[in-house]
Amino acid sequence: MISLSDIQVRTLRLRAQRLTPQPPGAETSVAQVVKDLCGIQAQEAPAAALSIRVRSAGLVAADVERARVEERTITRTWGLRGTLHLLATEDLGWLIPLLGPVFIAGDRRRRAELGLNEDICMRAIRVIQDALANHGPLTRAEIVEQLALHGIHIEGQARPHLLYRAALEGHICLGPDRDAELTYVLLSDWIGQKHRGLPLSDDDAHAELTRRYLNAYGPATPQDQSAWSGMPLSKTWAAWQSIADQLIEVEVAGAPAWMLKARAAWLDELPASTPIVRLLPRFDTYLLGYQHRVLSVPPRYAKRINAGGGILHPTVLVDGRVAGTWKSKRLKNYLEVAVEPFDQLVPEVQARLEAEATDLARFLGVQTTWHVLPPH
């Protein structure tokens, strides 16, 4: 078994995550970035766009919305961990049938508490489908009005849980925003059957999810994949065993981990001689892909990144390890970026940070100013 140093592990993961410079000729379309990562968490659309920015070259924020609303090569719906994601549209044919039943079952008790029994859910979803087919896109409030017209009165938190169920069953997804408000559309109308990809058997879908996970996050473990996907560990273990001939076992921090055999050549490549510095946004997938973050976040600063409540703050990443946080303020056509490092930054890292801040402003189409606060 090959034993990897922490630096080697972080270097491999950075490359898998598209956080190293892309080789000449590499495809950097929005859809390709999303597919390579097997989804990008997107409960905050601006943060999801910035996750794409940091993994591409030359794209701008408008390209992300164009890919979602006009080209429809990516779709915003509920996916991994039961949270909103940008997913490659061509992956929906196997991802939704794989993930949906697990999260629908996991939400059963909460639906019951909210008065959403199976009969109500089935009747309400039929009404939603008809309403969107005839009048969509519709906002949540407009959907609630349509339900009321059919004698189905849904209040409070029952509303998002009903829409969540409808999305996990593959009936609906998010459509174009209307005056900064979310709208919903019929998935079949929005993307068309031919664009959602082919379904897979349950076993094949689990195996594909494992390959895609390791493609973006390896070296890693089944426990890491289970935490990232929200799928049962037993199913994940079975999937790993089914593709064992495609994996290499390595040692990470004294414990076994795995990566794809197709990535074996990466083990012989040295880490970059210059620092790789990235400004990761809130909820970036680099920090969501593992059971623990000890390799990427210094333990004494963990609460600076995640103080609780599921919030992951924007981070400064230096060679795969979080070296601080950052925040930005939008002032008309100006972006003010403030970096809060954990320790003093060397000049070379500061120079890379300036390049990142400049590219962030380019992506957003604004001018920028940035400064580094004293370490704390």
Predicted regions and their residues:
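Long, low-complexity intrinsically disordered regions
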Residues: M1-V294, P298-H376
